[in-house]
Amino acid sequence: MLVVKADYKKYPIPVLEKMRIDEDEFYKKYEACVVVQTCNRIEAYFDTEVNSNVDDILKDFQGFDILKGKNATFHFLKVSCGMDSMILGENQILGQIKTSFQKAREFKKTSRYLDSLFLKAIHVGQRARTETKINEGGVSIGSAAVELAEKNFGLTNRNVLLIGAGEIGTLVAKALVEKHIKAVIVANRTYERAETLAKELKGMAVHFDKLREAVNFSDVIICATSSPHYILEKEDLIDVGNKIIIDIANPRDVDDSVRELENIELYTIDDLRNISDKNLQRRIEEIPTVEKIIEEEYDVLMKQIEKINVEEVLKEFNTYIEEIRVKELEKAIKLSKSKDPEEIMENFSKAFAKRITHDFVSYSLNTSKEDLMNSAWWKNGK
């Protein structure tokens, strides 16, 4: 297997956005392949048994990191468990892998090997999340904000206002997706960005000049802009009813004097750091258990792949035998009118055996002893 990859560890998000693969064009060009793309990573997986043009692939993906064989497989299993994610153990990557795999199958671009790999990766990701706590507790400031709101106020059937649709706002949005919220409103100075994020949340976007109305409508307000000045001040919140406000912006979006209002509970980024740090430490402690699951499932996958390889060789071998049989039978039929049937059968069987022996000896002489002993044909022949 071959993997070409670019991710947040090497490139900033704006650069990754420019490196994104046009999936329709990708699937037109390559066989036996799957592309997995998220906001933080771009990866393409190739079955090299089908794609022998590895050099051409590498030319097409200059700037991408390259992984092959065992390293590529282990990498993908770690990705499925969220161990290679910006947020350790995050759940979203598993759904993205499933969606990517399904799209490749719709294009009829997978292979028996890639089918086995992706189904195994999905299974490993599920095991990691059910048998360990690698995905429990919010570890980003965004998810910690949502966790705090849920713990202190409850989010079921609440109206949530997210102010800010940048990087931090997006992290908040990811954490909100999994909650049973009545309504989500996204406000941002650039309305188009608010609209894009609101679609992901199945919510609604509002223009910034409608912020007052959105505040009145909301139960929970999460502020995550990059504004150099306050977005909400004391006079904005005097008669808006009971609200919980979580300000995770830096610099702050909410004037601290808001704490003087009895109807407002204000939390800042300092209140969240303890939550996220403790949760991250708990997730880190689960890494050895997840790695053990990956190693176990890798061994199972290799046995599945070996079986596939043997089946493919047997299929080719049967085709090869059948071709010889048909050719020798045609010769025998031509001779059947002029020779003794017993002699014809004798000659047919000898010619058949001689042809197989000749081809096997030729294969053996042109193959190293090590390769011969490791070949599925030899193992099966023994």
Swiss-Prot record:
**In its UniProt record, which GO terms are filed under biological process?**
protoporphyrinogen IX biosynthetic process from glutamate
Do the record's keywords include Zinc-finger? no
User: From the UniProt record, which GO molecular function terms apply?
Assistant: glutamyl-tRNA reductase activity; NADP binding
Does this UniProt record's set of keywords contain Oxidoreductase? yes
Site feature Important for activity, where: 75
Q: Which CDD domains match?
A: NAD_bind_Glutamyl_tRNA_reduct
UniProt binding sites for NADP(+): 164-169
Q: What's the catalysed reaction?
A: (S)-4-amino-5-oxopentanoate + tRNA(Glu) + NADP(+) = L-glutamyl-tRNA(Glu) + NADPH + H(+)
Family matches, as SUPFAM superfamilies: Glutamyl tRNA-reductase catalytic, N-terminal domain, Glutamyl tRNA-reductase dimerization domain, NAD(P)-binding Rossmann-fold domains
EC code: 1.2.1.70
What metabolic or biological pathway is this protein involved in? Porphyrin-containing compound metabolism; protoporphyrin-IX biosynthesis; 5-aminolevulinate from L-glutamyl-tRNA(Glu): step 1/2
Annotated substrate binding lies at 38-41, 85, 90-92, 96
Query: What domain of life?
Result: Archaea
> What residues sit in the active site?
39 (nucleophile)
Key words of the record: NADP, Oxidoreductase, Porphyrin biosynthesis
Further remark: During catalysis, the active site Cys acts as a nucleophile attacking the alpha-carbonyl group of tRNA-bound glutamate with the formation of a thioester intermediate between enzyme and glutamate, and the concomitant release of tRNA(Glu). The thioester intermediate is finally reduced by direct hydride transfer from NADPH, to form the product GSA.
Similarity-based family = Belongs to the glutamyl-tRNA reductase family.
What is this protein for, i.e. what is its function? Catalyzes the NADPH-dependent reduction of glutamyl-tRNA(Glu) to glutamate 1-semialdehyde (GSA).
Q: What is known of its domains?
A: Possesses an unusual extended V-shaped dimeric structure with each monomer consisting of three distinct domains arranged along a curved 'spinal' alpha-helix. The N-terminal catalytic domain specifically recognizes the glutamate moiety of the substrate. The second domain is the NADPH-binding domain, and the third C-terminal domain is responsible for dimerization.
- Name recorded for this polypeptide: Glutamyl-tRNA reductase
